[in-house]
Amino acid sequence: MSVHAVVLIQCEIDEISEAAEAITDIEGVSEVYSVAGEFDLVAIVRVAEHDDLAKVIPGGIAKVDGVARTETLIAFQVYSKHDLERLFSIGFEQ
């Protein structure tokens, strides 16, 4: 089983790019998006266990230079078009 979380990140305005690059290097972070709105970055976190979130988010992302604030959304269920395509293609490869 794995745990997925979406981390909304506010950064110091002049450190967004550097923070994004540093966050992508943290184990457990699979993707980082630069976004418009209240938050500057969105990180997708995928870890093996719930306890691992503490290592990645407050122990990693929140400590990155330029990160001012984070808000974490823990996923109950993951829906992905890519996962569904893989599921339904089993046995139909040519």
Q: Which positions does each model-derived feature cover?
A:
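A compositional/biophysical signature of low hydrophobicity enriched in polar/charged and small residues
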Residues: 1-94
